């Protein structure tokens, strides 16, 4: 049931969020910096506050935190649908983000506990369960943009209200049908927080891994800009998400199995090198006039493929590594902090990249700058994460 829930979460999310940048630029006349700020705050209010949801999950359990989070997200989508100015939309977007700060760590903790059980039983490994989670999530990420692309001509507010209705169904199903999931109890929220913050290896891992969320967030921030540079409009943005979702559905499990046969060191290095290459490609091409027709979109499609290959290889391995670094305790808080570091990284990078992306709408030498910055930080993580994984695995072997 958790897998189906993840799918529906993404249907509602991807019905609206991929179109935020387009709506703000075309309907609210927002600048690139303002769009970067709003998207960055959306991610930070979600990922940056995950540690709150994680600690509350460890203290009070999965189900109550899930229900509260879903209720807040319904409120956020309704508020977004009623927004007519950028400040109003900003408040709504923060609510949408904070809601996930509550329910997402609860779901992550559930998968970690369930994955350990299935691995001990010899059914599937925890990394493979996380990969299945990605597949189900991608089904939702496929349906959401398709539905959004169809509804976009009707209006952004209607899309928001439909998303609210989807989460309303989830609220009822979780309240009445979905059973509670048991996680290892925590003596207090403070105990969970201090335990995580004292784990220096985890802090290093979270900082290095935070760039992965920065990369993923570029689908909402940088992709529309590159699409406009290549085609003259952002109209095809929904179909770019559809392409990415189909690509992930086809390759997630094969690539996850490939990564499982390698060490975590190799998988993380390959994943982040692929992500760095995706941005390096656009950095090379951005200063030049795009080719005519579909050839102009080809580099964007290659960028998306390389980006998602990197995610598909690295993310299941990294999520499994969290449980190892955490010694299987306080997993909700650990996952919360992992995403909080990512959210902070996205907020900072969005402000910087949002400004640089103002130069990337048209071919010019300065258009390469945001893509060079992204390439550099992904390359840094490709170097750091394998070293951290080696230390974590060696400590586990000594226990």
Task: Walk through the language-model features, giving the residues of each.
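Juxtamembrane intracellular "pre-TM" segments in multi-pass secondary transporters
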Residues: 1, 177-208
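A membrane-interface helix-boundary motif in multi-pass transporters
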Residues: 152-165, 355-378
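Conserved MFS/SLC helix-loop-helix module at the cytosolic interface between two early adjacent transmembrane helices
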Residues: 47-84
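C-terminal membrane-cytosol helix-exit motif in multi-pass small-molecule transporters
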Residues: 165-183, 384-388
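C-terminal transmembrane helical hairpin of 12-TM major facilitator-type secondary transporters
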Residues: 266-315
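Cytoplasmic helix-loop-helix junction between adjacent transmembrane helices
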Residues: 94-137
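Helix-to-loop junctions at the C-terminal end of transmembrane segments
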Residues: 49-61, 250-264, 357
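Short amphipathic helix-loop junctions that connect adjacent transmembrane helices
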Residues: 18-33, 221-236, 240
């Amino acid at each position: 049931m958790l897998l189906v829930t993840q799918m529906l979460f993404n249907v509602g999310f991807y019905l609206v969020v991929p179109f935020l940048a387009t709506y703000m630029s075309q309907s609210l006349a927002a600048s690139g910096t303002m769009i970067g700020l709003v998207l960055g705050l959306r991610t930070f209010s979600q990922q940056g506050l995950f540690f709150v949801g994680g600690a509350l999950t460890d203290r009070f359990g999965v189900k109550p935190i899930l229900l509260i989070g879903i209720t807040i997200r319904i409120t956020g989508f309704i508020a977004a649908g009623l927004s007519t100015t950028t400040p109003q939309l900003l408040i709504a977007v923060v609510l949408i983000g904070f809601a996930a700060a509550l329910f997402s760590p609860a779901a992550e903790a559930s998968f970690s506990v369930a994955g350990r059980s299935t691995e001990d039983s010899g059914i599937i490994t925890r990394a493979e369960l996380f990969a299945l989670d990605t597949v189900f999530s991608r089904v939702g990420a496929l349906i959401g943009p398709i539905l959004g692309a169809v509804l976009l001509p009707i209006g952004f507010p209607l899309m928001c209200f439909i998303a609210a209705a989807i989460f309303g169904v989830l609220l009822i199903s979780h309240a009445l049908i979905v059973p509670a999931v048991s996680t290892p109890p925590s003596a207090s929220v403070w105990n969970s927080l201090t335990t995580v913050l004292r784990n220096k290896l985890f802090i290093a891992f979270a900082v290095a891994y935070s760039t992965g969320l920065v990369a993923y967030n570029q689908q909402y921030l940088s992709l529309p800009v590159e699409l406009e540079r290549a085609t003259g409009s952002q109209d095809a943005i929904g179909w770019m998400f559809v392409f990415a979702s189909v690509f992930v559905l086809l390759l997630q499990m094969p690539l996850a199995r490939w990564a499982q046969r390698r060490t975590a060191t190799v998988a993380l290095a390959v994943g982040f090198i692929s992500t760095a290459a995706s941005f390096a490609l656009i950095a090379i091409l951005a200063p030049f006039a795009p080719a005519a027709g579909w050839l102009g979109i080809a580099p964007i499609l290659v960028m998306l493929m390389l980006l998602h290959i990197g995610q598909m290889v690295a993310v299941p391995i990294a999520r499994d590594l969290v449980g190892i670094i955490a010694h299987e305790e306080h997993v909700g808080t650990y996952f919360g902090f992992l995403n909080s570091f990512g959210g902070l990284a996205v907020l900072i990078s969005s402000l910087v990249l949002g400004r640089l992306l103002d130069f990337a709408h048209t071919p010019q030498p300065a258009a390469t700058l945001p893509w060079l910055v992204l390439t550099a930080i992904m390359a840094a993580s490709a170097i750091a994460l394998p070293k951290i994984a080696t230390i974590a695995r060696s400590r586990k072997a000594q226990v």
